[in-house]
UniProtKB/Swiss-Prot annotation:
Probable monooxygenases exhibiting no activity with isoflavones such as formononetin, biochanin A, pseudobaptigenin, daidzein, genistein, isoformononetin and prunetin, or with flavonoids including naringenin, liquiritigenin, apigenin, luteolin, or kaempferol. This is Cytochrome P450 81E8. It holds the Pfam family p450. The gene is CYP81E8. One of its GO terms (molecular function) is iron ion binding. Heme binds at C436. It comes from the Eukaryota.
Length: 499
């Protein structure tokens, strides 16, 4: 009972502080962007419905291309204009170079010290340099080319074995997910953890890893009101913080085990872990085990689900638009022919295939609200005053459907990217110094996968009804229903070498 009253007193104390901060901030800044009326304490949290980018779209239609909300005591500004977004990350790029801190960043992101969550400064610059040079540089990506090619060809082989004798129904989502996770994990550690042919000899190790990833992804997409109403964290009603603490310990132990395995020479040397451990020997202060584990977490969470989601959306659109599929197939037949499979170095010579990827990213950005930013000082934006410690979100989903920027904005039309400069209007990977550094890897994987799927197979929908394009609710904007389709090997194409 004593503990209960103590918790109650502490909660009331934080409640009073929250109210004081809320009303003081509201009075201090009179030229904030417009927004809906908010309630004491909770602000506008009661108005937030999933998917958030749809809710923000509705609000932007009423309040304009820049509007404000209160998530509890935290001010949030939402931008739905390309011009204002560009102003954010050119003129105000340094001011908006920080990230807000959430519980997931504390427990999964090593207390907000990874390159994704770290505050802007020397530590972040060092992490970005490591990521850009040691992991995602063109040289390093080229050294991992065989891994990407092998994992994609394993996917093609599975589909070919199923459909060599005629059209066969296949479920594509688990295949895409398996391919992207195995690709990243082989780059990181040299191991495959997914599929019946995974090469992890310890079955328990593979099961443990898959369980960790599933829970991390689930908790990473959870809505946590305690991030905005701090006094609720004392109660942890839904047990989220307790689960985050538990999974963070399991994740850390697993990643540390991988590092130790490579440190003592039990794996091959062409992996991300090995390259970073080599640097650790000469620069131990920059390449600590925690930094390496943080980079591993970022690669796994940012480089896997997003690519598989994009490929699934692309195939869904192609199945709904067979004339676009046919045009892409003709491009491949003309430039590549029937005697070999398309390869990664061919993608730059296949503009229509690239346009399909761009159009998919336009309509179905995996992160439709990008990653939130945090202002480090007061600044002006779009004629309004934005105070320090404001969370800024960019609704790329709305910008990518702006009729002032795109003709027939809701239609899937890859041809629009034949016009020079159109690709510069895409925000799928963010803008400014904190834009996603994995764009090159992502587009290599997506381009080659789609190219081979189109080149090697005939595709059609299961029935006359079009593919359902409803979005799921989650941290990445994937399809609500898994993609099933009919596929058949293109017999004129010589693909016997994939068996």
């Amino acid at each position: 009972m004593t503990t209960f009253y103590l918790s109650l007193i502490i909660s009331l104390f934080f409640l009073i502080i929250t109210l004081k901060v809320f009303f003081n901030t509201s009075r201090k800044f009179k030229n904030l962007p417009p927004g809906p009326q908010c309630l004491p304490i909770i602000g506008n949290l009661h108005q937030l419905k999933q998917p958030l980018h749809h809710t923000f779209h509705t609000l932007s239609q009423k309040y304009g291309q820049i509007f404000s909300l209160w998530f509890g005591s935290r001010l949030v500004v939402v931008v739905s204009s390309l011009t204002i977004a560009q102003e954010c990350f050119t003129k105000n790029d340094i001011v908006l170079a920080n990230r807000p801190h959430f519980l997931t960043g504390k427990y999964i992101g090593y207390n907000n010290t990874t390159v994704a969550q770290s505050p802007y400064g020397d530590h972040w610059r060092n992490l970005r340099r490591i990521l850009s040079i040691e992991i995602l540089s063109s040289h390093r990506l080229n050294s991992f080319l065989e891994i990407r090619r092998d994992e994609i060809m394993r996917l093609i082989q599975k589909l070919a074995q199923k459909s060599y004798n005629g059209f066969t129904e296949v479920e594509l989502r688990p295949m895409f997910s398996e391919m992207t996770f195995n690709t990243i994990m082989r780059m990181v550690s040299g191991k495959r953890y997914y599929g019946n042919d995974c090469d992890v000899s310890d079955v328990e190790e593979a099961r443990l890893f898959r369980g960790i990833i599933k829970e991390v992804v689930s908790l990473g997409g959870a809505n946590n009101v305690g991030d905005f109403l701090g006094f609720l964290r004392w109660f942890d009603f839904d047990g989220l913080e307790k689960r985050l603490k538990k999974i963070s310990k399991r994740t850390d132990a697993f990643l540390q085990g991988l590092i130790d395995e490579h440190r003592f020479g039990k794996r091959n040397s062409n992996t991300m872990i090995d390259h970073l451990l080599t640097q650790q020997q000469s620069q131990p202060e920059y390449y600590t085990d925690q930094i390496i584990k943080g980079l591993m977490v970022v690669m796994l969470l940012a480089g896997t689900d997003t690519s598989s989601v994009t490929i699934e959306w692309a195939m869904s659109n192609l199945l709904n638009h067979p004339e676009i599929m046919k045009k892409a197939k003709n491009e491949l037949d003309t430039h590549i022919g029937h005697d070999r499979q398309v390869d990664e170095h061919d993608i730059s010579k296949l503009p229509y295939l690239q346009s399909i990827v761009y159009e998919t990213l336009r309509l179905h950005a995996a992160a439709p609200l990008l990653v939130p930013h945090l202002s480090s000082e007061d600044f002006s934006l779009g004629g309004y005053n934005i105070p320090q410690n404001t969370i800024l979100m960019v609704n790329a989903w709305v910008i990518h459907r702006d009729p002032n920027l795109w003709s027939d904005p809701t239609c899937f039309k890859p041809e629009r990217f034949e016009k020079e400069g159109e690709v510069n209007k895409l925000l799928s990977f963010g803008l400014g110094r904190r834009a996603c550094p994995g764009e090159n890897l992502s587009q290599r994987t997506e381009g080659l996968t789609l190219g081979l799927l189109i080149q090697c197979f005939e595709w059609k929908r299961i029935g006359e009804e079009k593919i359902d394009m409803v979005e799921a609710k989650g941290i990445t904007a994937g399809k609500k229903t898994s993609l099933n389709a009919m596929c058949k090997v293109r017999h004129p194409l010589k693909i016997n070498d994939v068996f």
